[in-house]
């Protein structure tokens, strides 16, 4: 009985020490139609901690997700999925990451992942994006700045 108690205590301690290393998992759906319109990511803004994973799910086919060049932290890792394929991205470097769907960027299918402190927020310049995507990124950046 005493050995069982010691083993249980060891397992519990190990779980506490190891679980932060794995981080939490978040889900972003790639949709033709959702709560905020057509051709969207849901949610379009995800706030996470360093070490967390975002699972981009191609719920509706014909979408992909990629980080937008020049709109991620300087030491952040770019990411990209093939068309109609899911993608898991573990984020380590803090900051703001802009992501988009190549075929649907012109209609505003873009979003943000904010990892911890959004230190690079003032370096994000969406002016090179199509008008709808630019407008959406500006609105999402305003939400991050306002803490909403």
What is each residue range found by the language model?
Residues 1-4:
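Positively charged n-region of N-terminal signal peptides that target proteins for export
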Residues 7-17:
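Bacterial N-terminal signal peptides
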Residues 21-148:
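Extracytoplasmic copper-binding redox domains, predominantly the cupredoxin/blue-copper superfamily
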